[in-house]
Design a protein with these regions (language model features):
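Helical transmembrane-bundle signal
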Residues: 30, 59-65, 98-101, 191, ...
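Active-site helix-to-loop segments that bind/position phosphate- or nucleotide-bearing substrates
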Residues: 87
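Short, conserved beta-strand/beta-arch hydrophobic-aromatic motifs that form part
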Residues: 165
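Alpha-helical transmembrane segments and their helix-entry boundary regions
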Residues: 19, 81-82, 90, 157, ...
C-alpha cells in the first residue's frame, strides 16, 4: 500500500495503491464504452460491449474500501461524522459534473434530442436537481431519453452509491459476517436471475426511473457494495507479482468482449455478466489488494489513475453528449470521427486532473475544516 494519497483527511488509512490504479483503468473503459454509444443501435451491437460492468466493479471496490477504512471506527465515530466524510468525498464532483453539463447543454442538440426546445427555466431546475442528486422521472427529464440525470448521466451511480453508504452507516456495519454473507448471497442470486431471465440479458440498468432500472440498479448495489464489505472482512492477502498489469488487462478484456448469444439467447450474455460480477470482480479486488507496486513507474501510474478516476467518471459524459450529437449531425463513421474521439478521451483526462487539483481537493480541504472533520 502507498503511504501517500489524495485525501481530505489526515487520519485516513493508506490506500491500496493497485486498487486505485485499477479503478482508473475501469474509469477509462467507461469513457470508451460511452464513446461507442454514438454508433450502437442497441445493447446487442455496442462496441466495448460490457463496459457497463465497470460500475459493478466500482461498487465492489467501494464496499471494500469503506469496510477497510471504517469498520473498526464505529466505537468512536458517529453516523453523522461518517456521512459528512462521504459527502465531502463524493459531492463536490457531483456538483461540477452537473454544472459542466448545464453549460454545455444547448450545444448538444441533434435529431435524437432537440435541446433547442428546452426552456432555460427547465434547464435551471434540472441543474438544481442534478446538483442535489434528485432523480428525474422519464416524463420530466429535459433531454427526453429517460435518464435520471439528463445533464450528466453517470450521476445515477452516485445516487446508488449514496444509498449504499447510508445503508452501511445505519445497518450494514452492524451485521455479523455470517449475516452479511447471507445478504450477499441472496442479492447475488437476485441479480443473477435478473441477468439470466430478465428482459435485457444484461445488467446495464440503473440509470432511469423505470421498473426494470429500479429493480436492476438496486440489485447491482445490494450485491456489489455488501460483497465489497464482506471481502474487506475475510480477505487474506497472497503474494502476487504484476497484480496491477494483470488486473488492468483483465478489466480491458472483460469490457471489450462482444455481446454473447445475440437476441435469441439473452441468457448467455446474462451468464457472462453473472460470472463477471459474482466471481471475476471479487477476485480482481483481492488481486489488487494483495499486490504491491515494486517500481516507480507502476507506482506513479497507479497513483495518477487513482487520482483521476472519480473526476474522470464525473466530468466526461457532457462531452459524450456533444460527441454523440456531432456524429449524428454529420453522419460520421467511427474512423471519420476518430480524431474527435481521441481528443475527447485526452481532454477528459486533462479536465479531470484540473478539476481534481483546482477544485475537488481544495473544496474537500475547505469543507473538512468547516465541518470540523478530524
Amino acid at each position: 500500500m502507498s503511504d501517500t494519497l489524495s485525501s481530505a483527511f489526515a487520519d485516513t488509512k493508506p490506500h491500496y495503491n493497485i486498487l486505485d490504479g485499477l479503478r482508473g483503468v475501469a474509469a477509462l473503459t467507461v469513457v470508451c464504452f460511452h464513446l461507442f454509444e454514438a454508433y450502437a443501435t442497441s445493447h446487442l451491437d455496442q462496441k466495448i460491449n460490457h463496459g457497463y460492468l465497470a460500475v459493478d466493479f466500482f461498487f465492489i471496490l467501494s464496499g471494500f474500501v469503506v469496510g477497510y477504512a471504517y469498520d473498526d471506527r464505529w466505537k468512536t465515530m458517529r453516523i453523522a461524522d461518517f456521512l459528512k466524510r462521504r459527502f465531502i468525498r463524493l459531492h463536490p464532483m457531483v456538483i461540477i459534473g452537473a454544472l459542466i453539463g448545464a453549460v454545455m447543454f444547448y450545444f448538444q442538440g441533434c435529431s435524437v434530442w432537440d435541446v433547442s426546445q428546452v426552456p432555460v427555466v427547465a434547464l435551471i431546475i434540472a441543474t438544481l436537481m442534478n446538483v442535489l442528486l434528485i432523480p428525474a422521472t422519464p416524463g420530466m427529464e429535459i433531454r427526453g431519453v429517460g435518464e435520471m440525470y439528463p445533464l450528466n448521466g453517470p450521476s445515477w451511480s452516485l445516487f446508488f452509491e449514496y444509498i449504499g453508504n447510508i445503508l452501511y452507516a445505519f445497518f450494514l456495519h452492524k451485521l455479523s459476517t455470517k449475516v452479511l454473507s447471507i445478504l450477499v448471497l441472496s442479492a447475488g442470486c437476485g441479480l443473477a436471475i435478473f441477468a439470466l431471465w430478465g428482459p435485457l440479458g444484461d445488467i446495464c440498468v440503473g440509470f432511469a426511473l423505470t421498473e426494470e432500472n429500479i429493480i436492476g440498479g438496486s440489485l447491482r448495489l445490494l450485491f456489489s457494495f455488501p460483497a465489497g464489505l464482506l471481502l474487506s472482512r475475510i480477505f487474506k492477502p497472497v503474494k502476487v507479482r504484476g497484480a496491477f498489469w494483470i488486473g488492468s488487462f483483465s478489466i480491458v478484456v472483460l469490457s471489450a468482449v462482444p455481446r454473447i448469444g445475440g437476441s435469441e439467447h439473452l441468457w448467455m450474455n446474462g451468464l457472462y455478466d453473472t460470472i463477471c460480477f459474482a466471481v471475476v470482480f471479487p477476485l480482481l479486488v483481492c488481486l489488487g489488494a494483495s499486490g504491491k507496486t515494486t517500481d516507480k513507474v507502476t507506482t506513479r501510474v497507479c497513483r495518477f489513475l487513482g487520482d483521476i478516476s472519480y473526476p474522470l467518471y464525473m466530468v466526461h459524459y457532457p462531452f459524450i453528449y456533444l460527441y454523440y450529437a456531432w456524429v449524428k449531425n454529420e453522419n460520421l463513421t467511427f474512423i471519420q470521427s476518430l480524431p474527435g474521439a481521441v481528443a475527447l478521451v485526452a481532454g477528459s483526462v486533462v479536465l479531470a486532473y484540473l478539476c481534481l487539483k483546482l477544485y475537488d481537493e481544495p473544496v474537500r480541504r475547505f469543507l473538512s475544516r468547516r465541518l470540523r472533520i478530524i
